[in-house]
């Protein structure tokens, strides 16, 4: 009998165990599609990014012109640039939905997988931030200045740290050069860490909407979920093409069409939409160090979620109180996103402060209380 290469070849065997014969719960829903969509986003961003890097010049006097050159003179350069810029937005949409799924269905109980996922989120945010600086437009320059300046709030070493990051006494050529180097490097680190994320996931197997062990009812990943993933890819790529071809600048800031000018500050400095919720939390505290700590806490709080799980059930499927809180949290994050895009004036200041307070209140206090109440109501 001939050897089955798929199951015996050292490399093919690994691929087979992860993508073909992987035992998968039979009832996972569309919310489990976003992991593979993130993989597609990463591959697409690395591909388009590589093509852009071939024509981009990381120098303050040439960066803005080189991006214009890509859009005007390079074959399909406009398309590559639009796919890359809007691909970042889709990357964040997918990762936020992926995290939301993890929160709702208790996937965070796979602690290693969850913690690596949070590190991946932080790396993605860093990559997007340094990437936004590269076109060297007004918002690129001032965004870099404002956000890197936050490190100066760190006591004792802050100012030294900022000047070390800048490579001088302000955001200038050395800053742009190193940001380009980091923007090129980080996606490959993300790809490596994604494999670790998957390795830990495949140790325990996927969670499912009921939050119960599914060992008794597993089906092979291929063809059932491979075809479902391909449908997800098609839908996402259609939406991305729609955005990149018809309204490529919808999510961008018009200010970034002006070349960077250190002598003229834009009236409203704000990051891309996917950072606005964190930016609103940062702005809601009228103290530099306090704001920076709140900004860091807004993401790092996710590390505490598995420790605060007090329910006897894993998923929120049969927990109405927790469901109400979950959707309140989603609404809260949308409010923060909106407030982050508004100027710092009444009533946005107080709305931002209330939304920031309730963000931490729901995650750190109300979720555990609701879980304990639900246990009592069900006499668990």
UniProtKB/Swiss-Prot annotation:
Gene Ontology biological process: mitochondrial electron transport, ubiquinol to cytochrome c
Family label: Belongs to the cytochrome b family.
Record-listed heme b b562 binding positions: 84, 183
GO molecular function, a single term: metal ion binding
Keywords: Electron transport, Heme, Iron, Membrane, Metal-binding, Mitochondrion, Mitochondrion inner membrane, Respiratory chain, Transmembrane, Transmembrane helix, Transport, Ubiquinone
Note: Heme 1 (or BL or b562) is low-potential and absorbs at about 562 nm, and heme 2 (or BH or b566) is high-potential and absorbs at about 566 nm.
Residues engaged in binding heme b b566: 98, 197
Free-text comment on the cofactor: Binds 2 heme b groups non-covalently.
Taxonomic path: Eukaryota, Metazoa, Chordata, Craniata, Vertebrata
Subcellular location: Mitochondrion inner membrane
Principal cellular location given in the protein's record: mitochondrion
Residues in the signal sequence: none
Record's function text: Component of the ubiquinol-cytochrome c reductase complex (complex III or cytochrome b-c1 complex) that is part of the mitochondrial respiratory chain. The b-c1 complex mediates electron transfer from ubiquinol to cytochrome c. Contributes to the generation of a proton gradient across the mitochondrial membrane that is then used for ATP synthesis.
Keyword Transport: yes
Assembly notes: The cytochrome bc1 complex contains 11 subunits: 3 respiratory subunits (MT-CYB, CYC1 and UQCRFS1), 2 core proteins (UQCRC1 and UQCRC2) and 6 low-molecular weight proteins (UQCRH/QCR6, UQCRB/QCR7, UQCRQ/QCR8, UQCR10/QCR9, UQCR11/QCR10 and a cleavage product of UQCRFS1). This cytochrome bc1 complex then forms a dimer.
Obligatory cofactor(s): heme b
Species the sequence originates in: Lanius ludovicianus (Loggerhead shrike)
Transmembrane segments: 34-54, 78-99, 114-134, 179-199, 227-247, 289-309, 321-341, 348-368
Record's bilayer topology term: Multi-pass membrane protein
Protein name: Cytochrome b
Binding site for a ubiquinone: 202
CC per GO annotation: mitochondrial inner membrane; respiratory chain complex III
GN (gene name): MT-CYB
Highest taxon of source: Eukaryota
